[in-house]
UniProtKB/Swiss-Prot annotation:
Species the sequence originates in: Nasturtium officinale
UniProt record similarity statement: Belongs to the peptidase S14 family.
EC number: 3.4.21.92
Gene3D superfamilies: 2-enoyl-CoA Hydratase, Chain A, domain 1
Underlying gene: clpP
Keyword hit for Electron transport: no
Protein name: ATP-dependent Clp protease proteolytic subunit
Organism taxonomic ancestry: Eukaryota, Viridiplantae, Streptophyta, Embryophyta, Tracheophyta
Sample GO molecular function, one term: ATPase binding
Top-level taxon in the UniProt lineage: Eukaryota
């Protein structure tokens, strides 16, 4: 039996009465938000608008992005990453469960020293994929060129944010590389593993 989105009590400062709001709205007010699904245009636009709104509201208080995602659309994920770099407050990233593919790219985009993984979290990096098998020959060539540019960008970001040499990152991106929380820390994708 689905329970829907739970409601929780919330009292605004200066108000006497408590109102019931859905749990996500309550957490947003505390600057906490979640990527708990596949990354697509809709979820990336929601995360981007939240980050921008909250940074306008108060630009000195950190934002917290909790991640449990199998990945998704590369360009949508890159838009979330770019926004994290653009907004003034630090964005702390917390991996709980899985940060795979473009979700690991978002994870590594958190403020340096403020990227965390829960002890049993998993992180997976790999090269961006495409739908070559569906394309005509001319489209295939154009798409391959674009995919190479995207791969170079993603590789460059991982190198910059992890401190690993380009050859290590390039080699790791050749296949699906799964890491435990401590392995992700050693790889420079997260800075801390939360203690139990």
């Amino acid at each position: 039996m689905p329970i829907g989105v739970p409601k929780v009590p919330f009292r605004s400062p200066g108000e006497g009465d408590t109102s019931w709001v859905d749990i996500y709205n309550r957490l947003y007010r505390e600057r906490l938000f979640f990527l708990g699904q596949e990354v697509d245009t809709e979820i990336s636009n929601q995360l981007i608008s939240l980050m921008i709104y909250l940074s306008i509201e108060k630009d000195t208080k950190d934002l917290y992005l909790f991640i449990n995602s199998p990945g998704g659309w590369v360009i949508s994920g890159m838009a979330v990453y770019d926004t994290m770099q653009f907004v003034r407050p630090d964005v702390q990233t917390i991996c709980m469960g899985l940060a795979a593919s473009i979700a690991s790219f978002i994870l590594v985009g958190g403020a340096i020293t403020k990227r965390i993984a829960f002890p049993h979290a998993r992180v997976m990096i790999h090269q961006p994929a495409s739908s070559f098998y569906e394309a005509q020959t001319g489209e295939f060539i154009l798409e391959a060129e674009e995919l190479l540019k995207v791969r170079e960008t993603i590789t460059r970001v991982y190198v910059q944010r992890t401190g690993k040499p380009i050859w290590v990152v390039s080699e790791d991106m050749e296949r699906d590389v799964f890491m435990s929380a401590t392995e992700a820390q050693a790889h420079g994708i997260v800075d801390l593993v939360a203690v139990q």
